[in-house]
């Protein structure tokens, strides 16, 4: 298990409060398997993996916002495709 220096991670984010918010968001993604870890898991819990990613500069608040926006756009596109498909099925029935 790798050690995480919270101070180094906080320095990457800006302050410890934003660090907690960013790490919690990322850990939730990892826990729900919505995203793959950007660092080796090494049998660590999602919170430790999130902190390691932040410490290495792979994740920050802006990156998290972009990932979530991309996910929302992909979900909206999938929903629109499903609606179009159902409309076509109904029209042909």
UniProtKB/Swiss-Prot annotation:
Question: Do you know which InterPro entries this protein is assigned to?
Answer: DNA-dir_RNA_pol_omega, Pol_omega/Rpo6/RPB6, RPB6/omega-like_sf
Protein's name according to its UniProt entry: DNA-directed RNA polymerase subunit omega
Q: Which family does it belong to?
A: Belongs to the RNA polymerase subunit omega family.
* Underlying gene: rpoZ
Entry superkingdom? Bacteria
Q: Reaction catalysed?
A: RNA(n) + a ribonucleoside 5'-triphosphate = RNA(n+1) + diphosphate
- Report the EC code(s) recorded for this entry: 2.7.7.6
Q: What does this protein do?
A: Promotes RNA polymerase assembly. Latches the N- and C-terminal regions of the beta' subunit thereby facilitating its interaction with the beta and alpha subunits.
What is the uppermost EC class here?
transferase
Give the GO biological process terms: DNA-templated transcription
Family matches, as Gene3D superfamilies: 3.90.940.10
Q: Which organism is it from?
A: Actinobacillus pleuropneumoniae serotype 7 (strain AP76)
Q: Report quaternary structure and partners.
A: The RNAP catalytic core consists of 2 alpha, 1 beta, 1 beta' and 1 omega subunit. When a sigma factor is associated with the core the holoenzyme is formed, which can initiate transcription.
Q: Which of UniProt's keywords are assigned here?
A: DNA-directed RNA polymerase, Nucleotidyltransferase, Transcription, Transferase
What would be an example GO MF term here? DNA binding
Q: Name one Pfam family in it.
A: RNA_pol_Rpb6
Q: Which GO terms describe its cellular component?
A: DNA-directed RNA polymerase complex
């Amino acid at each position: 298990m790798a050690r995480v220096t919270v101070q180094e991670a906080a320095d990457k984010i800006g302050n410890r409060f934003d660090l907690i918010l960013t790490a919690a968001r990322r850990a939730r993604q990892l826990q729900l398997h919505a995203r793959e870890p950007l660092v080796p898991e090494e049998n660590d819990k999602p919170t430790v993996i999130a902190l390691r990613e932040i410490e290495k500069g792979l994740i920050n608040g802006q990156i998290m916002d972009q990932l979530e926006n991309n996910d929302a756009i992909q979900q909206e596109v999938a929903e629109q495709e499903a609606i179009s498909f159902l409309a076509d099925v109904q029209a042909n029935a």
